[in-house]
């Protein structure tokens, strides 16, 4: 009887050791790049869209959810956005998609924002695809460069950058139109 108990104890211990040996390594594995379409040649796509930040009127596309600490620099303010992306400067031109995300006042001594947004395309070849922009926007500079840190759909594994140029701003209500020239590397 003692031999049977000893034998069972050794078996249980052995099973416990074997079953726990791979616990830390089973969550990740090397994959074939072809399974994700990464065997294709990488492409560089350039496109230009116009971002309409509307703070005024009955249907604003930018809503301040946290007011600034002071009025002088916008520091500490956070605004959520669902801004139209159009093919041309006028807001009534063809809508290509939406810029969805937020911007936050991140500079104390200048008008500087942390931008975190997805450009979600809703028409044509890129319908359902997105690019993700995360970067610093010094809004009073003529040209602002921000990185593209990812994407989805046809922009899966995207990287690149955007150049933002303000085309129009209403200093009374804050409404603005900004040209985004996008340079995207993707498969």
UniProtKB/Swiss-Prot annotation:
Record's GO cellular component terms: apoplast
Source superkingdom: Eukaryota
UniProtKB keywords: Apoplast, Glycoprotein, Secreted, Signal
Keyword Secreted recorded: yes
Glycosylation sites: 71, 92, 127
Membrane-spanning segments: none
Keyword Disulfide bond: no
Signal sequence range: 1-20
Protein family according to the UniProt entry: Belongs to the plant dirigent protein family.
Record-given protein name: Dirigent protein 20
